[in-house]
């Protein structure tokens, strides 16, 4: 799924560019999506496309990094 948050479903919205002379042309407002590694409840790690609001709210469970000696 491109350009859509995999947690909240946020996707592009439509609006207008408005010039100084008040001419309106269509445009799209894109969500701020980032790719992040997410640990599933089964323990698998998956790269997901999520919005920054979901990242900050803690909806994405980051995988634990194993340190090697």
Swiss-Prot record:
One of its GO terms (cellular component) is ribonucleoprotein complex. Transmembrane segments: none annotated. This is Large ribosomal subunit protein bL28. It comes from the Bacteria. GO terms for biological process: translation. One of its GO terms (molecular function) is structural constituent of ribosome. HAMAP family: Ribosomal_bL28. Belongs to the bacterial ribosomal protein bL28 family. Keywords: Ribonucleoprotein, Ribosomal protein. The gene is rpmB. It holds the Pfam family Ribosomal_L28.
